[in-house]
């Protein structure tokens, strides 16, 4: 069963809005079941690749079943690997082949013996030993382990037996022979302590020492030794990275953070179970209460239907809800308060947010976010429940205990809590952006008196340089977002000898709408960059084709809107969201046209530079351009390279190279004075730069 076009478009827009950072993504079917889990170095690049035409059979089947998309942004690709492994083992998706077995990423185990040893393992046991990891890259882990065993004289034997003579490792100076009693436990433990500090992240001294050795090896031209030391430094830095999605703390715990702007509040819940990030939920609602009341109400509402963990981490006071949690759970629920930096409130849908929290974020399908709140929970009933819980706890426990605050593991918990807070903040930012686009389209419908909301808008712009290299750009916006796969460019050669913006606009409109592909949907609105002259030219073509598509022109100088058959332009307030939407479309069309225009000019200048060389005509100039890409690359080439590129004798290649190296003509100019169409239909003056 093929998904509907509207569903595919919704998923594609979600993919386009994904961040260009590493993370994990989940495809779900119509029943909400996870059918595929993947990780990506760039979420946006990876997700948008699913909507291209060419795919292998497996991917085509996957996309035919996909109905929802969810993604989680991570700080490092390393964490994406760990989280992918956890989620695959949790959901066992149908279309995942690897990582579905019980095999996990390896750990480093430091035993608790009198003379401990360190080794790689895949099993975690409650045996008193210390475990570090997991580590997705086994090769880097083995490199790090070899470095440890080279640097510190730690035993590698499985069983420590008393011996009269040490083994070969002692003679290789790789072991202090504790089996012979030649090293005291105290001296041995000093090395173990240094290894522990290294695994806990105290790497500055070790890395500095290795960097000195590497530089000394480079000065002595011992490059192989320097490369090995470089790999050791890289292994240390990778191994000691602290993961926020997996740790060795097996306690069940929840991290709850929230972010708000105005009356809109989003809560993010991260669930850690067995030392792994086991789940993430986002809930959006509206509230005008203070911080303590907002969090208390959410905790009571959420944990009325969910299991209460023994440990809960929040970034603001939970108030009376702390007692209610312990009373409902029947056991002590420890609520730890860890203050965080607050996020700046998003002011506009397109505002850029700068935070002090770690750059580890999560994004979720908006369908999974409960926009209307968790449940219908009135203020009166909530406060009554809080007071009742407080009375019950006071009667059974006496005075209220203080909320636990700082601890030795607070930095790690604060980082996870900051991740939850960033999840909540990004949900609000995304919600405001989507709501802003909807409001702008509705306002646009109102101002232009359109029959329906213009969900599909196509914009045109003309760009040229004094009448040369004339191009027209066509860009498409769907639901207020760019639809880049439907962008088009037109090389307008019919008017390449004179400046005629109106004729260029007529040609672009005609070429777009004369022969439309099968299944093509006409836009709800056409926007042209220009004044009444450009609008009239476009309308003339639409009338000739028998198309009744709403048309509007946006002039740059006064930001006036020109409508066909309207005697006066429409002037909107500079703060009007409809005007902002049209400006965004106009500017995108302008950018797209300018980029193509510059490309044509640069290519022409390069071809002319090659044509000035001896034995080079137009055909050979294009071949040289395709092979070398620039005049500078040609100058640094060999005669053999030139002869091979354009199939000429070696003597001619020597002549071409000699002329190129002696050439004083600038092959490419990066700055140009660009004479484009004027927004009001007037020709630009000499030397005027209009982009």
From Swiss-Prot:
Major localization class: cytoplasm
A GO BP entry: nucleotide-excision repair
Single annotated GO MF: DNA binding
Residue ranges that the Swiss-Prot or TrEMBL entry lists as coiled coil: none
Any Gene Ontology CC annotation: cytoplasm
Annotated keywords: Cytoplasm, DNA damage, DNA excision, DNA repair, Excision nuclease, SOS response
Ranges of Basic and acidic residues composition bias in the record: 668-680
Residue ranges of every copy of the UVR domain listed in the record: 204-239
The organism's place on the tree of life at top rank: Bacteria
Subcellular location: Cytoplasm
Boundaries of every GIY-YIG domain copy: 20-97
SMART domains from the UniProt entry: GIYc
Spans annotated as Disordered: 662-691
Alphabetical list of InterPro entries matching this protein: GIY-YIG_endonuc, GIY-YIG_endonuc_sf, GIY-YIG_UvrC_Cho, RuvA_2-like, UVR_dom, UVR_dom_sf, UvrABC_protein_C, UvrC
This protein's record includes keyword Cell inner membrane: no
Subunit structure: Interacts with UvrB in an incision complex.
Sequence similarity: Belongs to the UvrC family.
Function: The UvrABC repair system catalyzes the recognition and processing of DNA lesions. UvrC both incises the 5' and 3' sides of the lesion. The N-terminal half is responsible for the 3' incision and the C-terminal half is responsible for the 5' incision.
Protein name: UvrABC system protein C
Native organism: Treponema pallidum (strain Nichols)
